[in-house]
Amino acid sequence: MGALPRPADSPPPSRSLALQDTSIAAPTIAEVARLAGVSTATVSRALTQPDKVKARTRERVLEAVAATGFIPNAQARNLRLQATRTVILLVRDISNPFYLEIYKGVEEAAIDAGYKVLMGDARDDDERILRYVDMVRERHADGLILMVGRFPEALARRSRLPPIVVALEMLPGLDLPTVKVDNHAAARAAVTHLARLGHRRIAHIAGPMPDPMSLDRRDGYLAGLADAGITADPDLVVEGDFGLAAGRAAIRTLDARGVDYSAIFAASDQMAVGAMGELRARGRNVPDDVSVVGFDDIVLAEAVEPQLTTIHQPRR
């Protein structure tokens, strides 16, 4: 027997199933207040300014919060306090794996303190740095951690700056809290290590100049040579930008200059790994023909063959 004809004005049968609304309304501050026998203002004070509420009252409020499952609106509270609970980590090159390791350490500390972290890419661009600083000034974030090699002159002239901390870099002339390693001493130690292996012709692949961190590592390289009684040769120093391609280009530059070298100290692991790749492409073995030392101790240092000897830089 066929199906009964459907009246012309009736809607087609639905193929979807109606879902029963099983959502439960979130508990409100009023419910907490009722259960605790206090006003909503007292509940708010007990949660945001507990030192201003009597211990017994605070205890009743917390018991009511637990019983109802009430979750305080952190966003609204932060708005009242003009706080975002957000920190920006601004790095010079977001593609460098070293900064991802730093981010992990910063985020771990931030989460423990109730903050979240956003990561920004400066790209050595003054305008981008200014925009990130203005984000903090306009209260889109509570503070800025700077890991860039420059500070725009326009910012340096400002009489008041938002909360800024400089990390692992050095920005001379600025009165800003700074957390950094001793780049000069670390570079000096790297060259001393190579000199003790018997090397006398030690090349240096430097970072971009006049970046303060690059200068520190370059000067540490020169100090290490002096300690070993080695005369510095300007032709053995090549400037790079901390990236892999710069390491490869540095080997091509050194070879084009026709200089002899048996060891290389690179101002970053990425440049060191790039140099190792170019040396292999030119038929030279690492470390039998040329010893290479990097700086940073990124994951890549362990991934290459042979493993890269490098200066460890703490991330946390």
Features from the language model and the residues they span:
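Alpha-helical recognition/docking segments in bacterial nutrient-uptake
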Residues: M1-I24, T86-T192, R196, A256-D260
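N-terminal helix-turn-helix DNA-binding module of bacterial transcription factors
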Residues: M1-T84
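Flexible loop/turn connectors
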Residues: G2, R252-R316
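Short beta-strand segments enriched in small/hydrophobic residues
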Residues: L35, T40-R45, L79-S95, H193, ...
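Short, solvent-exposed amphipathic alpha-helices that sit
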Residues: R60, F98-D112, A186-A190, P212-T231, ...
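Hydrophobic alpha-helical segments within soluble ligand-binding/sensing domains
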Residues: P177-H204, D219, A223, D227, ...
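Short acidic capping loops at alpha-helix termini that bridge into adjacent secondary structure
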Residues: R200-R201, A232-L236, N285-V292
